[in-house]
């Protein structure tokens, strides 16, 4: 697997256990890289810090909810990812259809 992405923070499992398991998958050669999706900035940074502190594999990507209507991640998550050189793969770029409503032939009706 080139990139294994975990989706959402698991409140029932200690993040140390999750990061250890992900590291084991990378070290075994079953996974090349790991990424995360749909986490708060503090959760993502906590996971990264735990991985770094324990010499484990860190995330290389964040799949975040981002579009013209939802830009909340611009406050903390995006600046953190930019500073840490973590790639972003936004989901819902058309806002679940809210942004492209009224488009005809690919152009907005004015």
Task: Show the residue positions of the predicted features.
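Histidine-centered active-site/metal-ligand motif
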Residues: 7
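Beta/alpha (TIM)-barrel catalytic core signal, keyed to glycine-rich beta->alpha loops juxtaposed to Asp/Glu
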Residues: 10-110
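Acidic/hydrophobic-patterned starts of short beta strands in beta-sheet-rich repeat architectures
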Residues: 3-4
């Amino acid at each position: 697997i080139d990139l294994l992405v975990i989706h959402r923070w698991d409140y029932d499992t200690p993040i140390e256990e999750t990061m250890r398991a992900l590291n084991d998958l990378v070290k075994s050669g079953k996974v090349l890289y790991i990424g995360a999706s749909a986490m708060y900035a503090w959760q993502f940074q906590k996971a990264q810090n735990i991985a770094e502190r324990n010499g484990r594999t860190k995330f290389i990507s964040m799949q975040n909810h981002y579009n013209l209507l939802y830009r909340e991640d611009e406050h903390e998550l995006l600046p953190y990812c930019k500073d840490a050189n973590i790639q972003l793969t936004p989901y819902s770029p058309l806002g679940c259809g809210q942004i492209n409503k009224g488009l005809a032939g690919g152009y907005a009706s004015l």
